[in-house]
């Protein structure tokens, strides 16, 4: 599956070149030197903010994607006790579903990379059926993480609901993973989700692992202004206060049956909003857990499509 989405990238900073005439002027006139510095800074700023269009394509997840997927999973789970390596291996083993986002290759790139066993992964999408994989170490750790954070941040009634859903074998829960680097645009997520839904339908029809899911469990990277949170529980955060690292997660949030947020401030190295384009307002990093009925997926995709068309 190919995507027409484009990525905004920042070019490396570099000093502007000066010709001999400029150098002579700098040696002879201090005021000219000041003007040149200002001009250079302006040129550098223009270079840094220059947009570079890169074509992305989605590929079947393979062994060469292992390190890239691990890196993205570490951004999601941070210091949580989840076996990232085992989870990555699981995603690679069940590669009849899911895709890795990579830069589209030209023939020249392909020839140059013949000896390179590692692909650069900009994002990926996949799903782990928590019910089918019950007993697998990383799956049990994910369930324990959700329930523990729920106990710490929510009322007991919410904990009981999550516990019931995660341990109900008659209504399988799929852990939906859609991760990408922050500078990869949201436009690429729509075809990725649509392709995954097709793959899940094929999987169900052919009785392959993953099968039908009654619910989707989503762990989303979110943020809130530090001034708007207390030192106590985070729990049920108002939607208008949450900022989503992945724009499409907002539409999952709107349709979620159960949801709560918890702080990861002590686990995260990023505490300033500037890195996330939130105007340098001090931000508190959160993780937002959402349980979404599978039959609401079409509605979510419609909302996402509408959002991208504006």
Curated annotation (Swiss-Prot):
Q: Name one GO cellular component term.
A: centrosome
Per the record, the domain of life is: Eukaryota
Q: Which UniProt keywords apply?
A: Cell cycle, Cytoplasm, Cytoskeleton, DNA damage, DNA repair, Nucleus
Task: Determine if RNA-binding is one of this entry's keywords.
Answer: no
> Which Pfam families does the entry link to?
BCCIP
InterPro entries named in the record: BCP1_family
Acidic residues composition-biased segments: 19-54
- Where in this protein does the record put region Disordered? 1-59
Q: Any idea where this protein resides? A: Nucleus; Cytoplasm, Cytoskeleton, Microtubule organizing center, Centrosome, Centriole; Cytoplasm, Cytoskeleton, Spindle pole
Task: Indicate, by first and last residue, each region the UniProt record lists as having compositional bias (Basic and acidic residues).
Answer: 8-18
Single Gene Ontology BP term?
A: DNA repair
Q: What does the sequence similarity comment in the record state about its family?
A: Belongs to the BCP1 family.
Biological role stated in the UniProt entry: During interphase, required for microtubule organizing and anchoring activities. During mitosis, required for the organization and stabilization of the spindle pole. May promote cell cycle arrest and DNA repair.
- The name on file for this protein is Protein BCCIP homolog
**Gene name in the database record:** bccip
């Amino acid at each position: 599956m190919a995507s027409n989405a484009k990525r905004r990238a920042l070019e490396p900073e570099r000093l502007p070149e000066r010709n001999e005439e400029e150098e002579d002027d700098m040696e002879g006139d201090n005021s000219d030197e000041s003007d040149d510095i200002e001009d250079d800074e302006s040129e550098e700023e223009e270079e840094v903010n220059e947009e570079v269009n890169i074509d992305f394509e989605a590929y079947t997840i393979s062994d060469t994607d292992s390190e890239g997927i691990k890196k993205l999973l570490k951004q999601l789970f941070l210091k949580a006790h989840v076996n990232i390596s085992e989870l990555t291996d699981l995603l690679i083993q069940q590669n009849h579903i899911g895709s890795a986002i990579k830069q589209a290759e030209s023939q020249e790139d392909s020839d140059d990379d013949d000896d390179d066993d590692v692909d650069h992964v900009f994002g990926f999408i996949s799903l782990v059926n928590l019910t089918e994989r019950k007993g697998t170490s990383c799956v049990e750790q994910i369930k324990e993480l959700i329930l523990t954070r729920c106990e710490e941040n929510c009322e007991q009634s919410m904990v009981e609901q999550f516990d019931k859903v995660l341990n109900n074998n008659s209504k399988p829960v799929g852990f939906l993973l859609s991760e990408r680097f922050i500078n990869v645009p949201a436009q690429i997520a729509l075809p990725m989700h649509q392709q995954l839904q097709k793959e899940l339908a094929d999987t169900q029809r052919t009785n392959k692992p993953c099968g039908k899911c009654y619910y989707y469990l989503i762990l989303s990277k979110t943020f809130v202004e530090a001034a708007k949170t207390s030192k106590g529980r985070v729990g049920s955060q108002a939607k208008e206060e949450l900022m989503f690292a992945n724009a499409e997660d907002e539409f999952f949030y709107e349709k979620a049956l159960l949801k709560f947020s918890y702080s990861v401030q002590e686990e995260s190295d990023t505490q300033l909003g500037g890195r996330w384009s939130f105007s340098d307002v001090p931000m508190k990093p959160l993780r937002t857990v959402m349980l979404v009925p599978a039959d609401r997926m079409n509605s979510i995709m419609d909302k996402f499509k509408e959002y991208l068309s504006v």
